[in-house]
Design a protein with these regions (language model features):
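The DNA-contacting recognition helix of HTH DNA-binding domains
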Residues: 17-18, 28, 39, 57
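Charge-dense, extended regions
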Residues: 167-231
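DNA major-groove recognition helix of helix-turn-helix/homeodomain DNA-binding modules
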Residues: 44-59
């Protein structure tokens, strides 16, 4: 989130700077400086602005390039984080504090093993938050050699969007796929299920979808089988 987005959100509500400053508990002068980029927006302020101005979770701050994976995700409750971002499969967990969906998606894709229900929610993140910071996401996915996993998630998201007749969303996702295509890795991987047996791996090499084969992933996940595909 930057000053331009802050100003756009204020104008969207037809508020003057004085009205917004009162709601955000800052002075009008300080709000003006933030909108002009002369003062930084703290995380605490951004979280308040999200609620007051009804901004999407994509406005939440992202970690620096160096710190994107600095904190271990092994204790992350990804089901709760998906629920907090509105994923219907975990709607009963929506009370959790939200994080930027690009950060949640990246950290989940970097996990060696995920609950299958969580893995199924990752294409939903890409589809629902199609306007997330893709430059940040793709850069960091490439740093950790996770671009194939990301490409597969985006491929399923595009497939589901097309099935829902969401042409503009599908178009955006296809444009991101083109970027990921240029960075596609030749080595075999799984879609966050590294603990599968050799027998399972052999079976999946023969029975995976064309999309999974294209991204060199061993998985039986298909867009048509996702619970939200027909919503």
């Amino acid at each position: 989130m930057d000053g331009n987005l802050l100003k756009e959100a204020r104008l969207e509500k037809h508020w003057t700077q004085e009205q917004a400053a009162l709601a955000l508990d800052v002075t009008q002068a300080y709000l003006s400086m933030m909108e002009k980029g002369h003062r930084p927006l703290s995380e605490r302020f951004v979280r308040k602005a999200l609620k007051v101005l009804n901004l999407p979770a994509t406005a939440l701050p992202l970690r620096s390039e160096e710190g994107a994976m600095a904190v271990s995700s092994h204790k992350r409750d990804f089901s709760a984080e998906l629920g907090a971002l509105g994923y219907p499969g975990f709607s009963y967990l929506r009370s959790r504090r939200r994080r930027n969906p690009a950060e949640v998606l990246l950290e989940a894709l970097n996990e060696p093993n995920l609950d299958a229900r969580v893995a199924e929610g990752l294409p939903w993140l890409a589809m629902t938050y199609v306007d997330m910071d893709w430059d940040w996401l793709v850069r960091n996915a490439k740093v950790h050699d996770r671009q194939n996993r990301l490409g597969f998630a985006v491929s399923l998201a595009s497939e589901v969007s097309e099935g829902r007749k969401q042409s503009e969303r599908a178009r955006k996702l296809r444009s991101y796929l083109e970027v990921l295509e240029r960075a596609r890795l030749a080595r075999e991987d799984t879609f966050c299920h590294d603990s599968m047996t050799q027998a399972e791996r052999a079976w999946l090499r023969e029975h995976r979808s064309p999309a999974a084969a294209h991204w060199n992933l061993l998985t039986d996940m298909k867009g048509e089988h996702l619970a939200y595909a027909s919503e």
